[in-house]
From Swiss-Prot:
Species: Pasteurella multocida (strain Pm70)
Enzyme class: transferase
Recorded coiled-coil stretches: none
Assigned keywords, A-Z: Cytoplasm, Methyltransferase, rRNA processing, S-adenosyl-L-methionine, Transferase
PANTHER family linked: RIBOSOMAL RNA SMALL SUBUNIT METHYLTRANSFERASE C
Name under which the protein is recorded: Ribosomal RNA small subunit methyltransferase C
Gene name linked to the record: rsmC
Family per record: Belongs to the methyltransferase superfamily. RsmC family.
């Protein structure tokens, strides 16, 4: 099964023949293995995709060169711009690129984004997607330092949060995390796992308040991991930061697993990651250990929590969010 975007690309296989090809962006299927190219590589920011594929580079930056670059558009325009500018800044004049994306994700805006850097034209429209061909004429400037954002918040004391584009809670402390942090009114001890750490807000806050904890922070997103690492470093805090698809790369058991888990996948609502978190958490908790999560009040997590833990407590709630606690 391949994505709608890949189904559109499948109509244009002649572009790939006898070329070295680099796939990037939001690709999430097996299409790269099907193209009639001389060589194929993939650059992905998503560990859940990269961990199960060969020839996939999971990293913040990419230095690969290719005759043809193929970019899968995602909903987050800032993340798209970050990755496109990085790719084109190191490419030679005349670099060929295909950009494909769903119309509902805003792929049309690629024309305005890339117009100043070369020739771009729409060459196909199908499966509610657009496919664009681009040829580089003017090399864009790219500096990683230009993309960092930082903020502080009264809830966080003197912590300063650092984040890159596309990372959750990148520009300000979100309401759900604020509510979750408000429930940390009792000392935190032992081993702590911040799952889906984003820019590192939750883990850094706990480590600042309770320096003795042994902290692990995990996320699937390369930009989130880089953001958490910088948030820790800039605040002189230490923790282990790992790439993991929920618990796929997590070892050991914890006294506290804490999370503001994602419930959006692109522009769709997805429960896979949260369902896995709840279903598998008991195997990663010490006896009596706690799982504490914040979630939109309308999401059906109480039933999942009760199914796997027997019961749950609501530690705090607003009209939009609830903080749930269960113990192993």
């Amino acid at each position: 099964m391949i994505s709608l975007e890949s189904q559109v690309l499948q109509r244009h296989l002649s572009f790939f023949e006898h070329k070295s090809v680099l796939f990037a962006g939001g690709i999430n299927d097996q299409f790269p293995q099907q193209v009639p190219a001389r060589s194929v590589k993939v650059w992905s920011w998503y560990f859940d995709y990269a961990k199960s594929k060969s020839a996939v580079d999971f990293s913040l930056t990419c230095e690969e060169k290719a005759d043809l670059m193929v970019f899968y558009w995602t909903k987050n325009k800032q993340e798209v711009q970050f990755q496109l500018m990085q790719l084109l800044a190191q490419a030679p004049i005349g670099q060929e690129m295909l950009i494909v994306g769903e119309n509902r994700c805003g792929v049309r805006s690629v024309e305005k984004m890339l117009d100043a850097y070369g020739d771009i034209a729409k060459i196909d429209s199908a499966r509610r997607c657009g496919l664009y061909h681009f040829c580089l004429k003017n090399t864009p400037h790219f500096a990683l330092a230009d993309y960092w954002k930082t903020y502080q918040h009264p809830r966080l004391g003197d912590l300063r949060i650092y984040s890159l584009p596309g990372v959750f809670s990148a520009n300000e402390l979100d309401v759900g995390t604020d509510l979750l942090l408000s429930t940390l009114d009792q000392p935190v001890r032992g081993k702590v796992l911040d799952l889906g750490c984003g820019a590192g807000v939750i883990g850094a806050y706990i480590k600042q308040q309770y320096p003795q904890v042994e902290l692990t922070m995990a996320d699937i997103h390369a930009l989130a991991l880089a953001s958490s690492q910088r948030t820790l470093a800039e605040n002189q805090l230490e923790a282990e930061v790992i790439a993991s698809d929920v618990f796929s790369n997590v070892a050991g058991k914890f006294d506290l697993i804490i999370s503001n888990p994602p419930f959006h996948d692109g522009i769709d609502t997805a429960y896979r990651a949260v369902s896995e978190l709840i279903m598998q958490a008991k195997w990663h908790l010490v006896p009596g250990g706690e799982l504490r999560i914040v979630a939109n009040a309308f999401l059906p997590y109480p039933d999942l929590l009760d199914q796997h833990f027997g019961s749950h407590c609501v530690l705090a709630k607003t009209t939009k969010f609830k903080v749930y606690s269960v113990r192993g």
